[in-house]
Swiss-Prot record:
One GO location term (cellular component): plasma membrane
Name of the protein in question: Glycerol-3-phosphate acyltransferase
UniProt-annotated location(s): Cell inner membrane
Catalytic activity field: an acyl phosphate + sn-glycerol 3-phosphate = a 1-acyl-sn-glycero-3-phosphate + phosphate
EC number: 2.3.1.275
Summary of subunit composition and partner proteins: Probably interacts with PlsX.
Keyword hit for Transmembrane: yes
Any one GO MF annotation of this record: acyl-phosphate glycerol-3-phosphate acyltransferase activity
NCBIfam families, sorted: glycerol-3-phosphate 1-O-acyltransferase PlsY (TIGR00023)
Membrane-protein topology: Multi-pass membrane protein
Function: Catalyzes the transfer of an acyl group from acyl-phosphate (acyl-PO(4)) to glycerol-3-phosphate (G3P) to form lysophosphatidic acid (LPA). This enzyme utilizes acyl-phosphate as fatty acyl donor, but not acyl-CoA or acyl-ACP.
Transmembrane regions: 14-34, 70-90, 99-119, 129-149, 162-182, 185-205
Keywords, in A-Z order: Cell inner membrane, Cell membrane, Lipid biosynthesis, Lipid metabolism, Membrane, Phospholipid biosynthesis, Phospholipid metabolism, Transferase, Transmembrane, Transmembrane helix
């Protein structure tokens, strides 16, 4: 297949178009934009250098402590919305569950490797939350609750995020077998495999490797 034929095929294939859109939309660096526009500061030069909510909080706290919490929450909402919107679009177009899960994964990859910031970005947690809420809402909401409880107890963002992710994945191995979940919100009924969710989990753990190292060395800062 020639290069031109490949391009034409891509432009005429709705799945391929959505894959590209998911990556590009997921790559919108809302945290970076908020801090850059409001305070003329590049959060990639501060703290963990991530563009996610935790580093937004850390960066803004040094400049305007009264706004730090609100901008951090806004960043979480916006980053989660990226994943939610692309999956919702796929659902409305009647795409297969396999495609929906692929789109969710690509939105997360886009956030972590933003094409607008030299393929650098955040840790992917908020975008993952938004991506899976429409696919596995029961486990997703339970994971959010776990995240909130662990955050309140330990007050360390990375611990709450990682345990929340583990909890969500673990529940997909349990809840579909003990609760009569509708086929449309059960990963087993959707695609008969946990593979995409496990890949998302592994990827989020990968982006948190520096945090995990700091946890073991006792150097991870409390933020929440």
């Amino acid at each position: 297949m020639s290069f031109l034929s490949s391009v034409l095929y891509t432009l005429s294939n709705i799945n391929m178009i959505f894959y590209i859109v998911a990556f590009l939309f997921g790559g919108i660096p809302f945290g970076w934009l908020l801090v850059k526009v409001l305070y003329k500061v590049d959060i990639r030069d501060i703290g963990s250098k991530s563009i996610g909510a935790t580093n937004v909080y850390r960066a803004v706290k040094e400049i305007d402590e009264s706004k730090a919490k609100y901008l951090s929450i806004l960043t979480i909402i916006l980053d989660a919305t990226k994943g939610l919107i692309v999956v919702l679009g796929a659902k409305l177009l009647g795409m297969s569950y396999e495609t929906q899960w692929s789109i969710a994964l690509l939105a997360i990859l886009g956030h972590c490797y933003s094409p607008y910031l030299g393929f650098k970005g955040g840790k992917g947690v908020a975008t993952a939350i938004g991506s899976v809420l429409l696919l596995i809402p029961v486990e997703g909401i339970c994971g959010l609750i776990i995240w909130g409880i662990v955050g309140k107890v330990f007050k360390i963002s990375s611990i709450s995020s990682l345990i929340g992710v583990l909890g969500t994945i673990g529940l997909t191995f349990v809840l579909p077998y003990i609760l009569p979940l509708p086929d449309c919100i059960s990963i087993i009924k959707q695609i008969n495999t946990h593979t995409p969710l496990v890949l998302i989990g592994l990827f989020i753990f990968y982006t948190h490797i520096p945090n995990i190292k700091r946890l073991f060395s006792g150097e991870e800062n409390k933020v929440l």
